[in-house]
Amino acid sequence: MAAAAEERMAEEGGGGQGDGGSSLASGSTQRQPPPPAPQHPQPGSQALPAPALAPDQLPQNNTLVALPIVAIENILSFMSYDEISQLRLVCKRMDLVCQRMLNQGFLKVERYHNLCQKQVKAQLPRRESERRNHSLARHADILAAVETRLSLLNMTFMKYVDSNLCCFIPGKVIDEIYRVLRYVNSTRAPQRAHEVLQELRDISSMAMEYFDEKIVPILKRKLPGSDVSGRLMGSPPVPGPSAALTTMQLFSKQNPSRQEVTKLQQQVKTNGAGVTVLRREISELRTKVQEQQKQLQDQDQKLLEQTQIIGEQNARLAELERKLREVMESAVGNSSGSGQNEESPRKRKKATEAIDSLRKSKRLRNRK
């Protein structure tokens, strides 16, 4: 209902139903006749007391809309943001007040979420493996999902809110975010994030889709070369007890919104500088990793060469052992015959040479 009304307001270029809403709020549907002219008492006669006005004959400016804006905001603060968004249909003055309250409500719920998230993070351990098993793990997951929703809503609405073309329209979304945050703060063992955030995801997605499809095309036609800087700047003040509160004063009360935007821009710049530093560190780490990989490849190549050398040495040792065995067998066989005593010194010399070569090869292998 509030979204359809916002679309109609955007097409007409103004909010509410005009200044005549204050007369409707008075409760009198018929025009009262003017009071009779006072009769001057005759000389010597006693003056009669003037009759009191009936409740339906009170001045029409004695209504809710005619109260000061601070009083109206104090009264509306007891209502939900969904009801406040629907009260924009009353009149232009009520539309101005409700717009300010909706914009401030979105900023307040962002600050409340930041406070809750800071409190939960302060109690969580620093290690990621310990966080998963912590009792506040689900609290952190829910708050992270709410942060994503707030970022999407901020990107969708706040561009046009800062341009004073509209306000934060879906008040029901603010109520739902407050409900989720209070549930997280008051529950020790909450449900899973997708169960808690199902309603918030549904209504926020519908609100953003409707805004992009129905209202953004109308607002975009007002963006280029438009002299209208928003209802809060261009609407004349409604006469009443708070007429001294001019439009510029109304706009000055929205300066916290621009301060928040400036703070966010500074935070974005700080985050950008941090990202640049992290990228530089990542590039340095990648260079170190490449150097380590190159050293590992060189070590693998050397290991392969050493393995080949050891294999060749083992083959030579096996061959020398085989020759030594043959020499020893032949020496033993020849020593048994008497006719071959002349060749025994030569055989012994060969055996001695074979043993020496075997010892040298073993020494070489030990050095490797």
UniProtKB/Swiss-Prot annotation:
One GO cellular component term noted in the UniProt record for this chain: kinetochore
Modified residues (Phosphoserine): 235, 242, 344
Protein's GO biological process: protein polyubiquitination
Signal peptide residue numbers: none
Transport as UniProt keyword: no
Residue ranges, compositional bias (Gly residues): 12-21
Pro residues: compositionally biased ranges: 32-41
Compositional bias ranges of the Low complexity kind: 22-31, 42-56, 333-342
Function: Probably recognizes and binds to some phosphorylated proteins and promotes their ubiquitination and degradation.
Compartments, record wording: Chromosome, Centromere, Kinetochore
InterPro entries: F-box-like_dom_sf (IPR036047), F-box_dom (IPR001810), FBXO28 (IPR039719)
SUBUNIT field: Part of a SCF (SKP1-cullin-F-box) protein ligase complex.
Gene assigned in the entry: FBXO28
Domain named F-box: residues: 61-109
Family matches, as SUPFAM superfamilies: F-box domain
Keywords for this protein: Centromere, Chromosome, Disease variant, Epilepsy, Intellectual disability, Kinetochore, Phosphoprotein, Ubl conjugation pathway
Name assigned to this protein: F-box only protein 28
Modified residues (Phosphothreonine): 270
Gene Ontology MF term list: identical protein binding
Biased composition regions of type Basic and acidic residues, renumbered to the chain: 1-11
Keyword Phosphoprotein applies: yes
Chain positions covered by the region annotation Disordered: 1-56, 328-368
Highest taxon of source: Eukaryota
Linked pathology: Developmental and epileptic encephalopathy 100: A form of epileptic encephalopathy, a heterogeneous group of early-onset epilepsies characterized by refractory seizures, neurodevelopmental impairment, and poor prognosis. Development is normal prior to seizure onset, after which cognitive and motor delays become apparent. DEE100 is an autosomal dominant, severe form characterized by global developmental delay and onset of variable types of seizures in the first months or years of life.
